Amino acid sequence: MKVYKDVFTNDEVCSDSYNQEDPFGIADFREIAFEVKSNKRIKGNDDYGIADNSEEAVDGMGADVEQVIDIVDSFQLTSTSLSKKEYSVYIKNYMQKILKYLEEKKPDRVDVFKTKAQPLIKHILTNFDDFEFYMGESLDMDAGLTYSYYKGEEVTPRFVYISDGLYEEKF
């Protein structure tokens, strides 16, 4: 299994157990980012509805049981709110930081990053109100944010990651 970690904080933010797709359904963004679909799961109770053979075990849940988004729970992501102006300042600094990282560690990615990053960020800014932002476990604003949004009528969010801000670790 591969776990994806932030290059600046080593926060675990995703794994290869999730199918990676084109961000926002736009194939051109795939060179710089990827998107995964989340699921809800029940956390807390040991029974999980097995005793009553219920497909929707939520009905009989006790007070100590809650529904969680699997990616948020598994990787200890924390929702954070940013104004559009705050995000603009953050992303400008983050993109400069990623560019410097790529120049030092992955010079072959610099041109791709320079070409593809701007349209991706423009898409995020254009649809800013559709996003929820998540931070990794360290809660360090130097790290990359994870972008969450709902696609169509789906009941769980999709999460988008900037690939060049992550590295893979095999387990």
UniProtKB/Swiss-Prot annotation:
InterPro entries: Mss4-like_sf, Mss4/transl-control_tumour, TCTP, Translational_control_tumour_p. Keywords: Calcium, Cytoplasm. Gene3D superfamilies: Metal Binding Protein, Guanine Nucleotide Exchange Factor, Chain A. One of its GO terms (molecular function) is calcium ion binding. It comes from the Eukaryota. Residues 1-171 form the TCTP domain. The keyword Cytoplasm applies. Involved in calcium binding and microtubule stabilization. This is Translationally-controlled tumor protein homolog. It comes from Plasmodium knowlesi.
